[in-house]
């Protein structure tokens, strides 16, 4: 297993432990309590990741990617979507052309 997957698995487990936590003392609990805020933060991190990719170099991209993945995990948890559900969606798309997969989606 990749080091990234191991770290993400531990991080996802830690995020789950923050559900129901005190939002005044835990940033993660604050985001988990407010899915709209979690979504906003994910959007901000996505933009910062794109900027790092085109203008700031590999180290900045790695750092912003870490922030992006953290905020994505929080949003998924805040929305009560399991990582297995996401994995199922990805698995269903394996071996399908991206263009064919997009064309098959409902509008």
Swiss-Prot record:
GO terms for cellular component: cytoplasm. It is found in: Cytoplasm. It comes from the Bacteria. Keywords: Amino-acid biosynthesis, ATP-binding, Cytoplasm, Histidine biosynthesis, Hydrolase, Nucleotide-binding. Its main location: cytoplasm. Its EC number is 3.6.1.31. It catalyses: 1-(5-phospho-beta-D-ribosyl)-ATP + H2O = 1-(5-phospho-beta-D-ribosyl)-5'-AMP + diphosphate + H(+). One of its GO terms (biological process) is L-histidine biosynthetic process. InterPro entries: HisE (IPR008179), PRib-ATP_PPHydrolase-like (IPR021130). Pfam families: PRA-PH (PF01503). CDD domains: NTP-PPase_HisIE_like. GO terms for molecular function: ATP binding; phosphoribosyl-ATP diphosphatase activity. Pathway: Amino-acid biosynthesis; L-histidine biosynthesis; L-histidine from 5-phospho-alpha-D-ribose 1-diphosphate: step 2/9. Signal peptide: none annotated. The keyword Transmembrane helix does not apply. Belongs to the PRA-PH family. This is Phosphoribosyl-ATP pyrophosphatase. It comes from Caulobacter sp. (strain K31).
């Amino acid at each position: 297993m990749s080091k990234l997957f191991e770290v993400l698995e531990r991080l996802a487990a830690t995020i789950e432990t923050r559900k129901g936590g005190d939002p005044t003392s835990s940033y993660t609990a604050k985001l988990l309590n407010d899915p709209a805020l979690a979504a906003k933060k994910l959007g901000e991190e996505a933009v910062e990741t794109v900027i790092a990719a085109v203008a700031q170099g590999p180290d900045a991209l790695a750092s912003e990617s870490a922030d992006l993945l953290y905020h994505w995990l929080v949003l998924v948890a805040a929305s009560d979507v399991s990582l297995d559900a996401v994995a199922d969606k990805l698995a269903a798309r394996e071996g399908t052309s991206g263009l064919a997969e997009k064309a098959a989606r409902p509008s």
